[in-house]
């Protein structure tokens, strides 16, 4: 394939998501109000759906230093009788097998390699590092998931490969982690980067993206409560779960220009988490913050 054909193919691939999103918006906006139950079931399914994207070259380079890349089987009632092979990325610290272990956890539609820029500096600071692809993300099987399954993976890995000295969590991983810590997982320090803190915020963002009418939003909330209990929102919102975590110091980092998760989400988490501090950045957005040298330095210094 010549360069022109390759460029045309890439251009078409880049436009596909935009075309699909426009189609979804048209359907939800024009048909959703007429058939809220039918279209609501579709929206409810999309809520749990994940999608995978190609790994950038910079992440491939970060992974080259990993000591071990392998699938680790975990078992939890969340996945029924079958073991789930979770892809893990592990960095040893020389011959020091007793070095404190830091767990990195990515966000929704993310991947373990996204967090790998932290590995080198953490190794230099005397830590070992574990990252992983959560359920239904990148190299770990599954097409749909939710916070309870993703928390089950985090807790199972911590039990199997731990103890975990500290956690560095990005985005949705920063909501999963407080939930995990109130359901048996143990650690000594936590860094949350660009985390959402309210279930309501996630639903509002989802609804805004797909142009969901209120009738569809109401259907989804009722379905959530029917499937997971009337107190679902309180159970998973980290402004609630973090209130129980005053014994664990936390650093919360968020960029003022983050358009995916508003900085107000971190500000409210900071207020709720008794033993937390917060740092603000500018101009980094939601993802570039993960490989900003100052953010990495602040994270490592906090974990020392």
Language-model region placement:
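Short alpha-helix in the alpha/beta-hydrolase fold that links the catalytic acid
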Residues: 118, 262-271
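Alpha/beta-hydrolase active-site loop
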Residues: 144-165
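An N-terminal hydrophobic leader/cap segment in hydrolases
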Residues: 14-78
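Short beta-strand/loop motif that positions the catalytic acidic residue
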Residues: 245-246, 252-254, 258
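Gly/Ala-rich beta-loop-alpha elbow adjacent to hydrolase catalytic centers
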Residues: 168-177
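Catalytic histidine-centered segment of alpha/beta-hydrolase-like enzymes
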Residues: 284-294
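Hydrolase active-site cap/lid region
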Residues: 183-231
